[in-house]
Amino acid sequence: MEEQKKRTAREIIENYDGPAVRIMEVCGTHTHEIFRLGIRKLLPKQVELISGPGCPVCVTPVSFIDEAIYLALEKQVTICTFGDLVRVPGSQMSLAGAREKGAKIHIVYSPADAEKYAKEHPKEQVVFLSVGFETTTPAGCLSVKKAREDGLSNYSLLVANKTMPQAYQALKGSADVFLYPGHVNAITGTALLSLIHISEPTR
C-alpha cells in the first residue's frame, strides 16, 4: 500500500501538465532535505524549485562581520560565535583572518555556551554574535537573562537577527509559491503569516 502511494505521487509529479510554477523554500532544513532526497530531479521541467535565503549566516551583512572584527581587534573583546560564521568575509577579512592576527574568536554551539564562557572568564569582555531567524533568537535572549541572574557585567550580544515576514517582503515577486518553515510558526504562531503580503510574481 505504501509503495502504491509512492508510485502514485511520483506519477502525479511526472505527469504534471499545468502552467509553469516557481516554488521557493526559505528554510535551511528544507534546502538540505530537498538536496538529500533528490527532489529537484523528480520535478517536471515547468516546475522550478528555488532556494531562498534560508541560512541566516548566508545573509549576514558585511557590516556586521566588520563590527565584530573591530570589537575583537581594536577593543580586545572575546567573540563567541557559531563555527559557520567564522569564514564569512567582511570588507577586509573574515573572523578567521582576524583570529590569525591575534583576535580571540571562540567557537560555541549555543548562546548558553557563550554565557558560560563569560562566567568562567570574568576578566574578558565576551560578545556573542547573535544571527538567525525567530527560532534561534529566544536562546540569545535567554542567555542575556541568565547572565543577569549570574551577575555578569562582561557578557553582551552583537545582534543581526532577522524575521521571516520581512524576508518574504524582500522576496515578493520572486516566486509563485513559498514554502513556509513550520518551526518558525512554533515560535511565533500562525498569526504572523497575516503580515505577509506577496505581490504577483514578475516574469
Residue ranges and their predicted role:
Residues 194-202:
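Residue-level detector of conserved catalytic or cofactor/ligand-binding positions
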Residues 76-81, 85-87, 181-194:
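Extended, charge-rich low-complexity interaction segments
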Residues 68, 143, 198:
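Aromatic/hydrophobic pocket-lining residues that form π-stacking "cages" and hydrophobic walls in ligand
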Residues 1-123, 137, 158, 168:
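Metallocofactor- and cofactor-centric catalytic cores in central/energy metabolism, strongly enriched
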Residues 129, 133-192:
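Phosphate/pyrophosphate-binding betaalpha-module
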